[in-house]
């Protein structure tokens, strides 16, 4: 991810009133909803996690829209690869040949997710 000297200022302003990671995720989701226009071309530049199907590193996809956030993977998007449609965590995707504002917004989210992320969910029944 290219260094953006204003990224920390943007994230600080966006997240200033948030009390925890879940509130930060909600604030970032609102920010992304304002910045992104679908469909949006992207490339996957993060290897898949165990149990992740369909989208591999280097795959080019079209982001079709947002899905409900996931407690482990954060903001989820619906993507098309060829004729198939998949769910994919947004942090695995980088906009490709898109407007600068869209690239900046996704890079802001990816920076936050990789630095802060979401707390691990502990299942009380385990």
Outline where the language-model segments fall:
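Basic/aromatic-rich interaction segments and small domains that mediate binding to polyanionic partners
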Residues: 1-104, 115-125
